[in-house]
């Protein structure tokens, strides 16, 4: 063998050795040690624990919100369950008041009927009061569009504009919620 061939043969194993060394170094760099793996797992575990803790807090808050909403809905249902029924009874109160207004107070023959209607109306209004149904009678008060419905406006001298001068139909509230607005005649400037 010539010197050149010997040099080439010697050079090849050295190249392989360098390549093997680089591959081994790369393998060592790629393969983390047990401590590094443990550290990575601990970091990942800490992240998962934090995410679970946050999810737990959100879930507890959601449960609390659902519970509060359910309690509020139950209270609301109890408070306003009578709204439709009360609305139907308002016409009874209106008719009793109209009946009283139609009877002649001076006629002795109708005195018994008048007293009967008055007692019936009083009994109905007392029942309304027991269930927090309040009557709105805004005679001589300023007009309030949240509680009153203006049926007409009439120019009236010596009366402040936007004052209720006549109540055509009384309004009612159930636990502070308007069931029916008072239907009124309102004054306007002449």
Swiss-Prot record:
User: CDD domains given for it?
Assistant: GrpE
Q: Name one GO molecular function term.
A: unfolded protein binding
Q: Which PROSITE patterns match?
A: GRPE
Q: What is an annotated GO biological process for this record, any one?
A: protein folding
Source organism's superkingdom? Bacteria
Q: Where is the composition biased (Low complexity)?
A: 11-32
**Transmembrane portions of the chain:** none
Chain positions covered by the region annotation Disordered? 1-33
UniProt cross-references to InterPro entries, sorted A to Z? GrpE (IPR000740), GrpE_coiled_coil (IPR013805), GrpE_head (IPR009012)
Q: Name one Pfam family in it.
A: GrpE
GO CC terms on record?
A: cytosol
Q: Report keywords, A-Z.
A: Chaperone, Cytoplasm, Stress response
Tell me the PANTHER family matching this sequence: GRPE PROTEIN, GRPE PROTEIN HOMOLOG, MITOCHONDRIAL
Q: Tell me the protein family, please.
A: Belongs to the GrpE family.
Q: What does this protein do?
A: Participates actively in the response to hyperosmotic and heat shock by preventing the aggregation of stress-denatured proteins, in association with DnaK and GrpE. It is the nucleotide exchange factor for DnaK and may function as a thermosensor. Unfolded proteins bind initially to DnaJ; upon interaction with the DnaJ-bound protein, DnaK hydrolyzes its bound ATP, resulting in the formation of a stable complex. GrpE releases ADP from DnaK; ATP binding to DnaK triggers the release of the substrate protein, thus completing the reaction cycle.
* Complex formation: Homodimer.
Q: Report the protein name in the record.
A: Protein GrpE
**Source species, please?**
Alcanivorax borkumensis (strain ATCC 700651 / DSM 11573 / NCIMB 13689 / SK2)
Q: Which gene encodes it?
A: grpE
């Amino acid at each position: 063998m010539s010197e050149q061939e010997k040099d080439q043969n010697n050079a090849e194993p050295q190249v392989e050795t360098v390549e093997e060394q680089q591959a081994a170094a790369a393998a060592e760099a790629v393969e983390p040690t047990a401590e590094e793996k443990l550290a990575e797992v601990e970091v990942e575990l800490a992240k998962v624990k934090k995410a679970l803790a946050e999810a737990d807090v959100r879930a507890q808050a959601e449960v609390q919100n659902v519970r509060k909403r359910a309690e509020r809905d139950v209270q609301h249902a109890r408070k306003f369950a009578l709204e439709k029924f009360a609305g139907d009874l308002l016409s009874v109160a209106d008719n009793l008041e109209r009946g009283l207004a139609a009877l002649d107070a001076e006629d002795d023959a109708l005195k018994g009927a008048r007293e009967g209607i008055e007692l019936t109306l009083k009994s109905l209004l007392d029942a309304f009061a027991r269930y927090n149904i309040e009557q709105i009678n805004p005679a001589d008060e300023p007009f309030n569009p949240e509680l009153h419905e203006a049926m007409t406006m009439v120019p009236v001298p010596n009366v402040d504009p936007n004052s209720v001068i006549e109540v055509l139909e009384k309004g009612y509230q159930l636990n502070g919620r308007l069931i029916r607005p008072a239907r009124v005649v309102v004054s306007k400037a002449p």
